[in-house]
Amino acid sequence: MKDKIIYDFSYSSTKINEKETRRNDFIKITNNKNISAMSKIVKPNKKIVEIKKDEINNTETLIVNSETSFILKKLGMKQVTQKTIMLFDFLTEELLANNSYKQVKNIDPKVSFSLEYYAELFGRKFDSKYVRTALRKELTEEFSRFQSMKIVIKKEDGGEVSLSLASGYNTSGKTMSINLDIDLVRMILNSPLTILPKTSFLDNENYELSKKLSTHYHLDGNIKKGNNNILSVKTLLEASGTKIPSYDDVMSSNRAWKKRIVNKLDEILNKISKQQGIEWEYCLAKKEPLEVQIKDIKTYDDFLKLYVKYEYKND
């Protein structure tokens, strides 16, 4: 039996009574091609389906789906945002600049980068003292948030291991740096981590879908099976989170599901395609071409049966 991992994103001062567990530990892979670590931790862009309040302990548990939850203080706590997730993904990738997959000795938990590099990577302006000050403040707040977060690993013997995300940071001067928890770094270096296209960080709005396309495409197991370049429409809609409305929401309003769901997915995929050099098209389950044009699909159920075939032109 594998250890159960609980991803507890409360501040350390918050008492937690309710937690969601994951039954699967990090999977073993080869050739240093791994899945984004943060996607294993929390997915706040999913549509919230339930909120459980604990007035006594001053917490709210936002149940996102059957496998994932994250804990927030009811008062005064900043949420785990999309920006937080993107920054954590960026930091885990930067770890590989000074460390290697499965490394055991001489691990360097410190990640350093210039403020200008951060601005360029995330598509931010860097043309005035005011902007640079704002960026520095933003990173200070995010790093402070990391230092207050933790991961709890439940062991099968009934015990648990608590890991902080960071032990310290420095956002003064030209170089930004953060010391990630050494035990967390060991876990990251032994967990699935895919190097995402740098352009992924430019698009905050569609980041999760962009990451889904990249991680699925580059995972060794999918490459060996020959299905790394095809994803179902249903999976893509789920990865888009709240950016595309649900069918039920559409049908309870103007009922224009093609315009609000199909066209919106097309729009997002075209934007990602332009940013990352992806060629894509709709297809059937075994990559066969469609027998009709997408505009002629009659029902939403028929649309859900479709797949998207795609290739990274620069790979």
Predicted segments, located by residue:
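Charged, alpha-helix-forming regions
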Residues: 1-315
